[in-house]
């Protein structure tokens, strides 16, 4: 396998890892929106059961993150379809890098030890994987 093929495998693998992690995030957000009392691991860990406004926020976030997973998979060359036109995939991928960078910082400074323990490594992995996809893809 030459270096071009190795780079393509790396990018596809990174894209798949990011998509799986986003899938876990989407599932978590859907469960929060449904009222599962896991709020201590989200939104600063203020309440086990989220109030209605945060449940709605989780529902919206689940949809947005699912769409971003498709963008990452498209940028990584795993799928040919995404919810955005091809010309927007690059800029949207950089927006995602920015979101994961912010998420990593916020998860590092959250007052919730549980949220930090779960989501700091996840957000850092999503940031690293998305950077691989964007820079090498």
Predicted feature locations:
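Short helix-capping/hinge motifs at transmembrane helix termini and TM-loop junctions
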Residues: 36-37, 44, 75, 110-111, ...
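Structural signal for membrane-spanning alpha-helices in multi-pass inner-membrane proteins
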Residues: 29, 68-72, 107, 130-134
